[in-house]
Amino acid sequence: MVRTTVQDVARAAGVSVSTVSRALTGGIVSPATREAVLEVATRLGYQPNRAARGLITGRTGNLGLIVPDLRNPFFADVAKGVTARARAVDHGVFITDTDEDPVAELEALATLGRNTDGVLLCSPRASDADLLAAADPESTVLLHRRVPGLPSVVADIAGGIRQAVRHLRALGHRRIAYVSGPEDSWAAQQRLAALSAAGDLELLPLGGLAPTFDGGLLAGDLVLDSPATAVLAYNDLVALGVLHRLAARGVVVPERMSVVGFDDVSLAAMSHPPLTSVAVPKDRAGAVGLDLLLGRTGATTEREAVLPTGLVVRASSGVARP
């Protein structure tokens, strides 16, 4: 099949090639000319060559997305939100997985920053100082991380924690084991701070574990060695590991122990029992972040978006045992 060229569109529309280029890239042409060129381009099935368009506009039409672990369904959902929104606005996305390594995050930021129009960065581990030194605030948006001076999209972590604590309190729980994430993780610090501010409960922090299913398996034994009647996990993968370990040791959930996760990934509804979890708008965060990056939102000068969270109650949380 012969590919339609910009010259074909120009001939059919009765205009010059440069006029077609301006019409298709937002340049200065009359509304009537733009409409006529777009109609012809659509009728002929013309697909602009992104590289050639970049020579005209100085932009690549591509964006970068950096995530710490694509095996975690949380970040897979974020990526879905980014790519779906990018497709809707005719952009491509290069995705890099940094394997929870802050050095790799900064290296990927440098590489993608040179080769794309902007970068969406999920960076749980890199320090604020390193991010401020490496990231261009005009072409970088942080996802699920806040660093003063850089645009960001974050979830209302404190609000989600408060909902989870209210839920467990209403069920009679006063001794709650918190299986925290990595100590250098921004999200882990935010969640622990929100829990510590909750008051009226005995918080039993269990830290130093990986934010993974295997980390949750190890946490299950620590929970059973504590006086806790409920567990709040750093994320759903950890919570699912806890559930698995409790089941292996004959502990019935929620009759003997309640378990609450954070993120509400798709696996949460498939566990046994289904996992109560704080829902974070993962794909929406990706879409909002992309809009911030492309300047499509009319956001405040701080360029920060805070997205609401909500507790999804399922069968893993119940009344505290006497």
Model-derived features: positions:
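Alpha-helical recognition/docking segments in bacterial nutrient-uptake
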Residues: 1, 65, 71-166
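Periplasmic-binding protein-like
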Residues: 116-123, 175-180, 206, 226-235, ...
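Flexible loop/turn connectors
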Residues: 225-322
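Short beta-strand segments enriched in small/hydrophobic residues
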Residues: 17-22, 56-69, 167, 175-181
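Hinge/beta->alpha junction and helix N-cap segments in small-molecule ligand-binding domains
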Residues: 50, 68-77, 95-104, 153-163, ...
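N-terminal helix-turn-helix DNA-binding module of bacterial transcription factors
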Residues: 1-61, 321
